[in-house]
């Protein structure tokens, strides 16, 4: 079965409010206090929030994308789903490198069979090479203890991101419970070392399936789960299974202990962008994420915001941007294909594996194939501003130490020594009658965390 989807999208590059170091001028808001380390005084019930766009007063750039996606749908083995092949045309030219199987008959006659096989092997080797790099990168990441983690330059940044995930997961679990209050099943796609296991336990789910490409990470995830069971003697904990697989290339249903299993939630945190190397990989990721969701189930996650990444890139004088915490480097400006738009991401001096741009309107359109409807998409800043109004969320922010106390007390020091990194907080203190210390993130951390967004899709009845 063949279908053709044509879209002409006029999209104005999105941007969050610009960084402005004058609190009064930028309209910075107060919302919450935080507790830092145990030896620090209680902070005021307000957070000085620095607006988090990377470049001030940078003009929006209007882009017109004329996209034609041709999908060849074939019957699959598991549940009548479809795999697809794409041809992406822009200005009459294809952005995707054609595979041997997509060549016309005329080209086949001009190219010897052994050359075709060589080309196929090269393409497969490139794909396998990137998947192996992703697995190797996460396998090599060392487990870090709580003490060392608290000394990290990005301690508060990580905690803030973790708070975002906690609120997202808790909110969606509540939505599921409005429909059913027991036997909640979850698929954690790209689970890593199991950083969200505690969230699922607190959410009182019944069953969890964890899947990730990195085998060592999966072993560590499973060990965390076993340790959690041992610590909770008589307390109920969900059952779990652990699958090592490339979720952008392998069909997970074939690896489930129960091939008839369906889920209420699929969570994919900071991972789905790896699948946008090609349409086929992005579709397999969505098939794994959404193909086995119950009606009314949710696909949720966090991912880099392509509009913000491109906005910062275009505002930069080079092919890269960032600060001392993070850097993003593209191969070139002005050419952003829908698939395979690679960039290198570096966090706190650690070189990460290549990532791929996710054009979110395309993700939304592709998800419709699996009967998914976008419920919301928000930048981290938008999500924070909305959720911090809830008192329980405020308390969780403090417990998770997701904000830094400013100014630091005499027994501690600020996370950043960079000049101007707390100018927004200092300026606010001058112009407001507040109790100290305040809760905030450094300017550098705001810039790093504001490249992300949260999303939630719902499976239609």
UniProtKB/Swiss-Prot annotation:
EC numbers for this chain: 2.1.1.56
CDD domains: AdoMet_MTases
mRNA cap 0 methyltransferase domain mapped to chain residues: 152-460
Binding locations of mRNA: 161-162
Function: Catalytic subunit of the mRNA-capping methyltransferase RNMT:RAMAC complex that methylates the N7 position of the added guanosine to the 5'-cap structure of mRNAs. Binds RNA containing 5'-terminal GpppC.
Region Disordered: start-end pairs: 1-117
Residue ranges of the motif Nuclear localization signal: 107-109
Residue(s) at site: mRNA cap binding: 193, 199, 224, 273, 355, 452
UniProt source species: Rattus norvegicus (Rat)
Ranges of compositional bias, category Polar residues: 14-29, 49-58
Binding site for S-adenosyl-L-methionine: 165, 190, 212, 246, 269, 274
A Gene Ontology biological process term: 7-methylguanosine mRNA capping
Modified residues (Phosphoserine): 11, 15-16, 58, 94, 99
Name of protein: mRNA cap guanine-N(7) methyltransferase
InterPro entries xrefs: mRNA_G-N7_MeTrfase_dom, mRNA_G-N7_MeTrfase_euk, RG7MT1, SAM-dependent_MTases_sf
Gene3D superfamilies for the chain: Vaccinia Virus protein VP39 (3.40.50.150)
Catalytic activity: a 5'-end (5'-triphosphoguanosine)-ribonucleoside in mRNA + S-adenosyl-L-methionine = a 5'-end (N(7)-methyl 5'-triphosphoguanosine)-ribonucleoside in mRNA + S-adenosyl-L-homocysteine
Keywords associated with the record: Methyltransferase, mRNA capping, mRNA processing, Nucleus, Phosphoprotein, RNA-binding, S-adenosyl-L-methionine, Transferase
Record's GO cellular component terms: mRNA cap methyltransferase RNMT:RAMAC complex; mRNA capping enzyme complex; nucleus; receptor complex
Activity regulation note: Methyltransferase activity is activated by RAMAC.
Compartments, record wording: Nucleus
Signal peptide (from-to): none
């Amino acid at each position: 079965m063949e279908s053709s989807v044509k879209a002409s999208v006029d999209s104005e590059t999105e941007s969050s409010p610009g960084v402005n170091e004058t609190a009064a001028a930028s309209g910075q808001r107060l919302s919450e206090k935080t507790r830092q380390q145990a030896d620090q005084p209680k902070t005021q019930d307000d957070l000085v929030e620095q607006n988090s766009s990377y470049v001030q007063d940078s003009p929006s750039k209007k882009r017109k994308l004329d996209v034609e996606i041709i999908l060849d749908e074939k019957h699959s083995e598991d549940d009548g789903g479809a795999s697809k092949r794409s041809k992406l045309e822009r200005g009459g030219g294809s952005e995707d490198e054609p595979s041997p199987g997509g060549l016309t008959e005329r080209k086949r006659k001009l190219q010897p069979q052994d050359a075709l096989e060589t080309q196929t092997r090269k393409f497969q080797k490139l794909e396998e090479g990137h998947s192996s790099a992703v697995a190797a990168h996460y396998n090599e990441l060392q487990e870090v203890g709580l003490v060392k983690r608290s000394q990290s330059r990005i301690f508060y940044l990580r905690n803030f991101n973790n708070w975002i995930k906690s609120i997202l997961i808790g909110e969606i679990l509540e939505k599921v419970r409005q429909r059913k209050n027991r036997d909640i099943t979850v698929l954690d796609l790209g689970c890593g070392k199991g950083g969200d296991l505690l969230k699922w336990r607190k959410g009182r789910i019944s069953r969890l399936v964890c899947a990730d490409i990195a085998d060592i990470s999966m072993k560590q995830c499973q060990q965390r789960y076993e340790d959690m069971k041992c610590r909770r003697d008589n307390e109920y904990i969900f059952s779990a299974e652990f699958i090592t697989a490339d979720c952008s290339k392998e069909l997970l249903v074939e690896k489930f202990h129960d091939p008839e299993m369906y889920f209420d939630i699929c969570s994919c945190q900071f991972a789905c962008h790896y699948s946008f190397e090609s349409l086929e990989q992005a579709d397999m990721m969505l098939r794994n994420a959404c193909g086995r969701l119950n009606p009314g189930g949710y696909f949720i996650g966090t991912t880099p915001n392509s509009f913000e990444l491109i906005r910062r890139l275009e505002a930069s004088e080079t092919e890269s941007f960032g600060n001392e915490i993070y850097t993003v480097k593209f191969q070139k400006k002005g050419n952003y294909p829908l698939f395979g738009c690679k960039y290198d991401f570096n966090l706190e001096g650690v070189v990460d594996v290549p990532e791929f741009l996710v054009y979110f309107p395309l993700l939304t359109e592709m998800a419709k194939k699996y009967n998914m409807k976008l419920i919301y998409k928000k930048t981290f800043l938008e999500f924070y501003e909305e959720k911090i109004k809830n008192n329980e969320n405020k308390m969780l922010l403090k417990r998770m130490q997701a904000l830094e106390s400013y100014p630091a007390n005499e027994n501690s020091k600020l996370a950043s020594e960079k000049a101007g990194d707390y100018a927004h907080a200092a300026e606010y203190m001058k112009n407001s009658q507040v109790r100290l210390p305040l809760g905030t993130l450094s300017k550098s951390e705001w810039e790093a965390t504001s490249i992300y967004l949260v999303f939630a899709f719902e499976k239609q009845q």
